[in-house]
């Protein structure tokens, strides 16, 4: 469970992801948005998952956080369709999510959670104060044989 914040712009953040994470983060974003709705009394299409993960805590803390992640989720849906020529199943819950947005507490955008770490792979950028840089470094270290080079390099 994570939000790879490679840019403060939710659309660019989605565009910058490699193919593997584009697919994975679309599902995880949907799960985070659903968990926030469930925690605040709604009935989301996906069950609550990883309740106390820092990304989950961040998502449900304020409506501005939830809105940022929703825009990122929409961008991931578009990016997935552009890259693969098909619609991801998690794209189909957009209206259900949006109809329960009002349940999320009002508030400003708070600092992104920095979870840029995978100790089994020897990658840890959680000490980095600039969260977007932390995720860029994390992904650069883990970039596999994707055809595209990271756009920030």
Predicted regions and their residues:
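Phosphate/adenylate-binding glycine loop and adjacent helical scaffold
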Residues: 1-44, 54, 61, 74, ...
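Generic preference for hydrophobic/aromatic residues in regular secondary structure cores
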Residues: 3-4, 11-12, 94-98, 139
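Generic alpha-helical secondary structure signal
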Residues: 8, 20, 57, 77, ...
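Sequence-level detector for tyrosine residue identity
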Residues: 16, 46, 73, 80, ...
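Intrinsic-disorder-associated interaction segments
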Residues: 19-22, 26, 62-65, 69, ...
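Amphipathic alpha-helical packing elements
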Residues: 38-83, 89-93
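Domain-level detector for trafficking modules
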Residues: 91-105
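Aromatic-residue-lined binding/catalytic grooves and analogous aromatic/hydrophobic interfacial grooves
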Residues: 101-153
């Amino acid at each position: 469970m994570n939000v790879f914040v490679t840019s403060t712009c939710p659309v660019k953040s989605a565009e910058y992801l490699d193919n593997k994470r584009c697919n994975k983060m679309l599902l995880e974003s949907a799960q985070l948005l659903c968990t926030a709705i469930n925690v605040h009394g709604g009935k989301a299409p996906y069950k609550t998952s990883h309740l106390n993960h820092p990304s989950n805590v961040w998502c449900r803390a304020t409506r501005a956080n939830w809105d940022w992640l929703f825009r990122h989720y929409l961008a991931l849906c578009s990016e997935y369709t552009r890259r693969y020529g098909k619609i991801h199943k998690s794209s189909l819950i957009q209206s259900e999510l949006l109809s329960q947005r009002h349940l999320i507490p009002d508030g400003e955008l708070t600092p992104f959670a920095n979870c840029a770490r995978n100790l089994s792979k020897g990658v840890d950028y959680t000490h980095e104060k600039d969260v977007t840089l932390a995720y860029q470094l994390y992904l650069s270290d883990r970039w596999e044989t994707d055809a595209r080079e990271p756009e920030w390099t």
